[in-house]
Structures are given as C-alpha cells and as structure tokens.
From Swiss-Prot:
Similarity-based family: Belongs to the phytoene/squalene synthase family.
Organism: Daucus carota (Wild carrot)
Gene behind this protein: PSY
Functional note: Catalyzes the reaction from prephytoene diphosphate to phytoene.
Native organism taxonomy: Eukaryota, Viridiplantae, Streptophyta, Embryophyta, Tracheophyta
Catalytic reaction list: 2 (2E,6E,10E)-geranylgeranyl diphosphate = 15-cis-phytoene + 2 diphosphate
Keyword Plastid: yes
GO cellular component: chloroplast
Keyword Chloroplast (UniProt): yes
Any GO BP annotation: carotenoid biosynthetic process
Localization, UniProt: Plastid, Chloroplast
Database matches in InterPro entries: Isoprenoid_synthase_dom_sf (IPR008949), Squ/phyt_synthse (IPR002060), Squalene/phytoene_synthase_CS (IPR019845), Trans_IPPS_bact-type (IPR044843), Trans_IPPS_HH (IPR033904)
EC number assigned by the record: 2.5.1.32
Protein name listed in UniProt: Phytoene synthase, chloroplastic
Self-association state and partner proteins as the record states: Monomer.
Length: 398
C-alpha cells in the first residue's frame, strides 16, 4: 500500500522490552529457526516448508495474489479502475429469459443478505463500505460474511461440537463455491465475487487452517508461531479483500507492497485482539502470548490465570503493545494506495483498532478483568478523521 513499505519483513534478534520485533531490511538473512508446525491437513502452501520463518512462507501467498492481480490487469479487466460492472461469470443480468432474470434476482438478494449481516455485526465498517461502488461493497460484504461464518465454527455458540471433519466439510464447500457450485445464498454471493475479481482460494483455505489450529492448539512457543496463526485468522482477510477494493490508478506502489501492507493490518488487528482478550482467553484455558517471551519476562501461565496486574506485567504489556503498533504503522503507510472509494472503511478500521491499544494502557494494563473498548464518542470523532485521511491520494501520503 505504500512505495516505501518493505515488500516483506524478516525476523532478527532484536529486543524491545523483551519482545522480538521485525526488521524491514530485506537484505538481512533470517536468524530465527521456525519450529515445525504439523497442521492437520498437511497441504497448506504456507506451512509446506518448515525450514523458513513463518513470515517468509506467508510471503509466498502474497506473491501469488499479487501475480493474479497483475495478470488480471494485463487482460484489461481494469480492476484498478472504478469501472461499472453489470454482470458476472456466474449470473448474467443481460439474459432475457426468465431463468436468467430469476438467477439475477436471487443473486441480488444473496448480496443484500450479506449486507444485512455486515450491518448488524460490523456497523462502523459497514458504513464505510457504503462509500464504495455498489459492485465492490457487495463483494466485500460477501467476503466478510464467509469469514464470519468460518470464525463462528470454532468461536460461536456451537463451537464445542465442531470437529476437524466439520472443517474438512467446510473446506469442501469452499472448493465447490470456487467452482461455481454454491450451497446456499451466502455461498452464491461469494461464488459470484470470486468469479468477478482475481481472488485466490489460498487465503480462504489458510483461514480454515487457522480454525484447525484453534481446535488443537492453545499456546504458541514463539512469536514466529504466533505470526503464522495471526496470518491464518486475520492476515488472510487483507489478501482476500484488496483484489476487490482495488489499487488507486495513480499509485506508484508495487502490487506486492500493497498486499504486504494489507497483511500487516491483519496481523496488527489480531495482535490487538489477543492483547485485549488475555483475561477472557485465560478463563478458557488459552494463552496466545508467546511462551518464550513470557518466560523471559518471568511470567508463568499460573500468573496469567490468577490475573494480577504487577509492574512486571505492565512492562511486558508495553513491549507487546509497541510491537502491535509497529504493524499498524506499516499498514498505515499503505492505505492511501487503495482505490479512493475503498479507503474510508480501511482507515476507520485501522484508527479504531489502534485505539483499543490506547484503552488497554488507560486501564493500567489490566486486560485480565477489564475489556478495552472504544466508546461511542471516540468512534464519532474517528469516523470524520478516517474520512479526511481517505481523501488524500497516494502521492500526498509519504
């Protein structure tokens, strides 16, 4: 999303308050060894080679998505322009027969249903999408609903009944909808979206792999492991969405840097979720904070389960928050590279999520018994600010 955003980031031994951080120097070799992660499927492109760092493996997915977009540009579909779309491969509005019109009406209803879900569960983001072109906002709604349904499998009311086989069936549905064979209306909306925009299936599969990790893994030894998990459950969303949101025609950024910045925003959001929900996760027996870093700080699992805020905990949290902000900073450099009609919802999401970190600090780092949130007044202030930032073209944001 920004020309000066490093195309990828490499781990190296540097500490901030006892926390491993990332370096944007691409020429430096990685000195961290990545622990082998044996996911249940064993087929994820991201986890295929355990020798490299998680970041390096995730970058392969970034390259693949960027290549798809470049290929689409060469085929003159013009995804970076806000050209009006009147149909898709799945359903053609121009068909004159009754069956064609019925299909078109059903598709419109499917997208409307997705919009209703987005409006109910992501109100601020939904308002931002209303500034997009009708075609783009409907596609973003469809992606949002699929991601929400996927997350609900392991984090919803029926999560205790979900098995690995259920996730396998969900992945089968994903494959089918990418082949133009949706199971229900929500799937139909996404099937139309992925047939219209150059969206790769891999980030969707990787998100399902993230749900598999949640079923069998509740602790992460290193930040490298946690980074991979954050990519699976949140970074993937950025890779799904950018092909729909589009890149500004005047942008001088490389396609890879646009997707890398989108990935950074997803990682930042998930790290923020983890820091906000420490107490809630602990009550479920889960600790997402890197075990190695906790050990270096002298913090045991029992300490977290007791939930007592001490100077030791405050110092540890300062480092964790600083790292999350680093990811937000990298993402922020690139939002202006998006299509002008797509910037506001992204800016709104970024600014609001950053304020959750501020709220943790305002709570004196008590994320055991207090849930950090952004109040309505601050949200109302953030929305105009997000809108004003969305007006700036790429060349003016450096």
């Amino acid at each position: 999303m920004a020309c000066n955003f490093a195309v990828r980031v490499i781990y190296y031994p540097k500490e901030i308050h006892g926390v491993s951080v990332l370096n944007t120097n691409r020429s430096r070799k990685s000195r961290f060894s990545c622990r082998v992660m044996k996911l249940s499927t064993g087929v994820s492109a991201v986890a295929a080679n355990p020798v490299r760092t998680s970041e390096e493996r995730v970058y392969e997915v970034v390259l693949k998505q960027a290549a798809l977009v470049r290929e689409e540009k060469r085929s003159s579909r013009g995804l970076c322009l806000d050209t009006k779309r009147t149909g898709s491969k799945s359903f053609d509005k121009s068909e004159n027969d009754d069956a064609g019109m019925k299909s078109w009406n059903l598709l419109n209803e499917a997208y409307d249903r997705c919009g209703e879900v987005c409006a109910e569960y992501a109100k601020t983001f939904y308002l931002g999408t209303l500034l997009m072109t009708p075609e783009r906002r409907r596609a973003v709604w469809a992606i949002y609903v699929w991601c929400r349904r996927t997350d609900e499998l392991v984090d919803g009311p029926n999560a205790s009944h979900i098995t690995p086989k259920a996730l396998d069936r969900w992945e089968k549905r994903l494959n089918d909808l990418f082949d133009g064979q949706p199971y229900d209306m929500y799937d139909a909306a996404l099937a139309d979206t992925v047939s219209t925009y150059p969206v790769d299936i891999q980030p969707f599969k990787d998100m399902i792999d993230g749900m598999r990790m949640d079923l069998k893994k509740s602790r992460y030894q290193t930040f490298d492991e946690l980074y991979l998990y954050c990519y699976y459950v949140a970074g993937t969303v950025g890779l799904m969405s950018v092909p729909v949101m589009g890149i500004a025609p005047e942008s001088k950024a490389t396609t890879e840097s646009v997707y890398s910045a989108a990935l950074a925003l997803g990682i930042a959001n998930q790290l923020t979720n983890i820091l906000r929900d420490v107490g809630e996760d602990a009550r479920r027996g889960r600790i997402y904070l890197p075990q190695e870093e906790l050990k270096l700080a002298g913090i045991t699992p029992e300490y977290i389960f007791k939930g007592k805020v001490t100077d030791k905990w405050r110092s540890f949290m300062k480092g964790q928050i600083k790292r999350a902000r680093m990811f937000f900073d990298e993402a922020e450099k690139g939002v202006a590279e998006l299509s002008s009609a797509s910037r506001w919802p992204v800016w709104a999401s970024l600014l609001l999520y950053k304020q959750i970190l501020d709220a943790i600090e305002a709570n004196d780092y008590d994320n055991f018994t207090k849930r950090a949130y952004v109040g309505k007044a601050k949200k109302l202030v953030s929305l105009p600010l997000a809108y004003s930032r969305a007006l700036f073209a790429p060349s003016t944001v450096r």
